[in-house]
């Protein structure tokens, strides 16, 4: 098979706007580490702006449930941000691994603010834990931006990658594909028609390109620059 008349096309983008939410249930007292509980449901929530008068999902009870949201915050500008949550009952918020709001107790709907958090433009890790005790729950996540705008954080400023692999399908057996962005980021050999590049260390989307080597090591294809390459991307060989 010759790749001279073929291109790689992205058939699935790994970057999705929102945060990955994992839903749990608990007994007795709300646990300090909810992620040690069995996961009842999992989904990507575009933004955190919920008032539940019943179960948050069909698989989760209306009482004694918890949610762990994780992903990335996309800061639009450099400056000091103040984060706020409205919660009923408890919640904790981390930005770049630092606990900035800790309100882990039973309470009616209450608004809590973080201290000022200095952010550079771009991607920052974010994690929000929430638990609810009785039927009726509230959880909202917002910010006050450096320009003074206060809002629930929009989905366009939240992102998650679908997996820690970049998958390429349709290349010949024993070919190798490399991902480059100034330097080589990763590579994988084609096995059973599929190459899987480890994207665990790609912490935010990158603009890069692929090089394809045949079984003898010769470069047979170099892609154009592709924007926002990230874990969960899937590519296929297509004829041109």
Residue ranges and their predicted role:
Residues 1, 9, 128, 205-218:
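Short, aromatic- and glycine-rich surface loops/edge beta-strands on solvent-exposed regions
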Residues 6, 10-164:
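Acidic/polar, compositionally biased interaction segments
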Residues 84, 194-200:
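Short, surface-exposed beta-strand/beta-hairpin micro-motifs centered on an aromatic residue
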Residues 86-90, 169-175, 205:
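Short proline/glycine-enriched turn/loop motifs at strand-loop junctions of beta-rich domains
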Residues 120, 200-206:
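Surface-exposed, short loops/turns at beta-strand junctions within beta-sandwich domains
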Residues 139-140, 215-235:
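Edge beta-strands of extracellular beta-sandwich domains
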Residues 184-194:
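Short, acidic Ser/Thr/Gly-rich low-complexity loop/linker segments typical of extracellular
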């Amino acid at each position: 098979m010759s790749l001279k008349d073929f291109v790689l096309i992205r058939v699935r983008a790994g970057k999705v706007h929102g945060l990955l939410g994992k839903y749990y249930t608990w007994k007795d007292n709300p646990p300090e580490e909810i992620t040690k509980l069995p996961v009842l449901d999992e989904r990507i929530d575009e933004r955190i702006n919920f008032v539940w008068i019943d179960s948050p999902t069909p698989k989760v009870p209306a009482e004694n449930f918890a949610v762990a949201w994780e992903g990335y915050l996309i800061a639009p500008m450099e400056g000091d941000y103040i984060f706020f949550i409205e919660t009923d009952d408890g919640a904790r918020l981390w930005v770049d691994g630092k606990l900035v709001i800790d309100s882990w107790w039973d309470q009616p709907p209450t608004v809590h603010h973080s201290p000022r958090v200095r952010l550079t433009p771009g991607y920052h890790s974010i994690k929000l834990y929430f638990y609810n005790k009785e039927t009726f729950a509230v959880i909202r996540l917002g910010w006050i931006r450096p320009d003074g705008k206060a809002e629930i954080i929009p989905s366009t400023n939240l992102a998650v990658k679908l997996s820690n692999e970049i998958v390429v399908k349709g290349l010949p057996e024993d070919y190798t594909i490399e991902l480059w962005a100034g330097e080589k980021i990763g590579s994988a050999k084609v096995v059973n028609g599929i190459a899987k590049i480890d994207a665990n260390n790609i912490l935010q989307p990158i603009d890069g390109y692929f090089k394809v080597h045949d079984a003898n090591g010769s470069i047979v294809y170099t892609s154009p620059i592709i924007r926002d390459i990230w874990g969960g991307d899937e590519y296929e060989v297509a004829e041109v």
